[in-house]
Swiss-Prot record:
Residues 45-55, 63-82 have a biased composition (Low complexity). It is found in: Cell inner membrane. It comes from Cupriavidus taiwanensis (strain DSM 17343 / BCRC 17206 / CCUG 44338 / CIP 107171 / LMG 19424 / R1) (Ralstonia taiwanensis (strain LMG 19424)). One of its GO terms (molecular function) is membrane insertase activity. This is Membrane protein insertase YidC. One of its GO terms (biological process) is protein transport. The gene is yidC.
Length: 559
């Protein structure tokens, strides 16, 4: 059996299967590998609004402390109460423009002023309207206490930095003798909102409130391309259980599991390029919960018991609300493990050092496009010894083609004898039939890892290279790079030995066309990497063939 041909056929076949699967997902059909009917339904369903979105106060211990199930507790269905109305307070800093609704003290809208959409408008992360629902909520449970349905009163004060380092919004709500004061502090240059919660028992009987912090979001994806998709949904982190993603589908089916109670960690909502997270005060015990609270509305949250408050007593606790881009180094400084919301897929072990090196190159070159090119050159240098050995093996295989063809013709009716003769030929000539495939196989994990680096890195978003490439995170608008890539792949196939099998030869000629069509929909940064990689491979192969030719000439001259 021609093992090399088999491996190439497998790689080509899998490429076609993945191509077809991406087309299926792009057209709204279930993936053959990752079916998710819940997300398809969520994408077409309107976001929850009114009482369904506003009156869904969580119940105490909605999630067991053991974390074995995430099914909603009995009685946790949305309440049909009328939605309260409140004042919309707009806070503006150099990084965000946030809207806080005094009806519940909810952060109901948040714009990222340094991140822009294609139309030039700021990216809107939090939003609550008839199309989208995504907001940060907090309140007290353990009785009829102030929660995210209570109308709060806002203290007067500045709502913009205006040269200051920070701006505060103080909200006060009272219900049944319990007063809750929320203090949101927005700081210059930060995507973190410091949140303080002061609870006072102004009644005549002891109370035992529990603070909840949650992120509520509809199940629709944003910025989903035809040919790639990243994780969208809740995530939970603790020091013991590490990073744990929870799909909307599993939550809807009651199959999602959450970590046990801890005195560390955080909860988050993740989407392509951006994330939000509630980070409670470290050292205080809290439990986690996830829940589907409407056909197209989900939440992930934390419940922190505040203990028993005697009449007149006050207890305070702090938390931080992050809402911003997935910039790895910034996330590392905010909370342990928060950088994991940047989804590198299953090759994180390779992707993280690749991004580290790419970032170092960017610090020197100042342009992400040139940094990708420089990284590609470095990767080729690392793989050069292996590639040189491989091309030498391919050169030997090319010299053996006439003898291999003769063996195939001689034993075409006896496959077993043909394989024996082939193996004998390989042993005699000291040729490894897999030698030519090795660089391809070795580079596939690196290619996939770099794919996830370029796909997941918000730094590529809006980053220009030169000329017509104004954004490395979106496809080439004029398809110039995919066409150049197709030409380079065609040249590569011409430099390789012609396969003896006519069908295989045709497949190798068609592959450049297939891959170029697929790369029409890939981010320009990724295609740039592949184009440069192909051009360097062509130059490398030409040089090695030249060296091999000189070596053969020297041998002939000596003989």
């Amino acid at each position: 059996m021609d093992i090399k041909r088999t491996i190439l056929w497998v790689i080509f076949s899998m490429s076609l299967v993945l191509l077809y699967d991406n087309w299926q997902r792009a057209n709204g059909h279930a993936s053959m590998f990752f079916p998710s009917t819940t997300q398809q339904q969520a994408a077409s369903a309107p976001a929850a609004s009114g009482a369904a979105a506003q009156g869904d106060v969580p119940k105490a211990n909605v999630q067991p402390a053991t974390g074995t199930s995430a099914a909603p507790a009995a009685g946790a269905a949305p309440q049909a109460a009328a939605q309260p109305t409140g004042e919309k307070i707009v806070v503006t800093t150099d990084t965000v423009r946030a809207e806080i609704d005094t009806a519940g003290g909810i952060v109901s809208r948040l714009e990222l002023l340094k991140e822009h959409e294609k139309d030039g408008k700021p990216v809107v992360l939090f939003e609550r309207d008839n199309v989208r629902t995504y907001m940060a909520r907090s309140g007290l449970i353990g009785g009829d206490l102030p929660n995210h349905t209570t109308v709060f009163t806002a203290a007067p004060g500045p709502r913009a930095l205006d040269g200051a380092e920070q701006v505060q919004v103080v909200l006060t709500g009272e219900k049944n003798g319990v007063k809750l004061v929320k203090t949101y502090t927005f700081r210059k240059g930060s995507y973190v909102v410091d949140s303080k919660f002061d609870v006072t028992n102004a009644g005549t009987a002891p109370v035992s409130p529990t603070l909840y912090l949650e992120l509520a979001r509809d199940g629709s994806k944003v910025e989903q391309s035809q040919f790639y998709s990243t994780f969208t949904g809740p995530a939970i982190y603790t020091d013991a259980d590490k990073y744990h993603k929870l799909s909307f589908e599993d939550i809807a089916k009651g199959k999602a599991t959450v970590p046990a109670a801890a005195n560390n960690g955080w909860v988050a909502m993740v989407q392509h390029y951006f994330a939000s997270a509630w980070i409670p005060q470290t050292g205080k015990e809290h439990s986690f919960y996830v829940q589907q609270i409407d056909p197209n509305l989900y939440r992930v949250g934390i419940q922190q018991p505040l203990g028993e408050l005697a009449p007149g007593a006050t207890v305070s606790t702090d938390a931080r609300l992050f809402a911003g881009p997935q910039e790895e180094h910034m996330l590392e400084k905010i909370a342990p493990g928060l950088e994991l919301v940047k989804d590198y897929g299953w090759l994180t072990i390779l992707a993280k050092p690749l991004f580290w090196l790419l970032e170092k190159l960017h610090g020197f070159l100042g342009n992400w496009g040139w940094s990708i090119i420089a990284l590609t050159v470095l990767i080729k240098l690392v793989f050069f010894p292996l590639s040189a050995a491989s091309y030498k093996s391919m050169g030997k295989m090319k010299d053996l083609q006439p003898r291999m063809t003769s063996i195939r013709e001689r034993y075409k009716n006896d496959p077993q004898k043909m394989n024996q003769e082939m193996m004998a030929l390989y042993r005699t000539e000291k040729v490894n039939p897999l030698g030519g495939c090795l660089p391809i196989v070795i580079q596939i994990p690196v290619f996939i890892a770099l794919y996830w680096v370029l796909l997941s890195s918000v730094e590529m978003r809006g980053a220009p290279w030169l000329g017509w490439i104004h954004d490395l995170s979106v496809p080439d608008p004029f398809y110039i790079l995919p066409i150049v890539m197709a030409v380079s792949m065609f040249v590569q196939t011409k430099l390789n030995p012609t396969p003896p099998d006519p069908v295989q030869a045709k497949v190798m000629m068609i592959m450049p066309l297939v891959f170029s069509v697929m790369f029409f929909f890939f981010p320009a940064g990724l295609v740039l990497y592949w184009v440069v990689n192909n051009i360097l491979s062509i130059a490398q192969q030409w040089q090695i063939n030249r060296m091999l030719g000189k070596g053969k000439a020297a041998v002939v001259a000596k003989s």
